[in-house]
């Protein structure tokens, strides 16, 4: 299960950024492509488990799923791919292996916890 090692890498990166900025992380926002080879539910479970006893304990992993989009050389256009069975243009049927998006595994944002102001 490589999702655990991915979750641990995400946590390590977020902790390093939190340390550098002196903040607490409330959520990690991630783009996850359909063709990334990562199981969304497994990654969510692994993230929750791996956060225990870290600075990110209690934080959330927010995943934006990125669909597959191909470029068709015949149409000279990008098209979302609705079936993973055939990598063909949905408009003209031309086979295409040029994937424009859908392989992402990218941390795009860290949501910082709001701290209550110190009352004097």
Question: What are these model-derived regions, one by one?
Answer:
Residues 72-75, 89-92:
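Short cysteine-rich clusters marking metal-coordination/redox-active sites
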Residues 82-85, 99-103:
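Short Cys/His-rich "knuckle" micro-motifs
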Residues 31-35, 64-68, 108-110:
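Short loop/turn motifs enriched for small/polar and acidic residues
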Residues 1-62:
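Long, charged N-terminal interaction/targeting segments
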Residues 78-79, 96:
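Cys/His-rich microdomains that often coordinate metals
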Residues 62-70, 80-82:
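Immediate flanking context of iron-sulfur cluster ligation sites
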Residues 21, 29, 105-120:
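Long, charge-rich boundary regions
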Residues 70, 87, 105:
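Cys/His-enriched microdomains
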């Amino acid at each position: 299960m490589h999702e655990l090692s991915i979750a641990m890498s995400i946590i390590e990166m977020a902790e390093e950024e939190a340390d550098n900025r002196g903040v607490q992380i409330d959520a990690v926002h991630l783009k996850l492509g359909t063709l990334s080879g990562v199981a969304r539910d497994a990654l969510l479970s692994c993230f929750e488990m791996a956060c225990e006893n870290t600075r990110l304990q209690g934080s959330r992993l927010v995943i934006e799923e990125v669909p597959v989009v191909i470029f068709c050389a015949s149409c000279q256009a990008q098209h979302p791919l609705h079936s993973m069975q055939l990598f063909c243009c949905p408009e003209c049927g031309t086979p295409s292996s040029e994937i424009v998006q859908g392989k992402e595994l990218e941390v795009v944002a860290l949501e910082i916890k709001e701290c209550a102001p110190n009352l004097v």
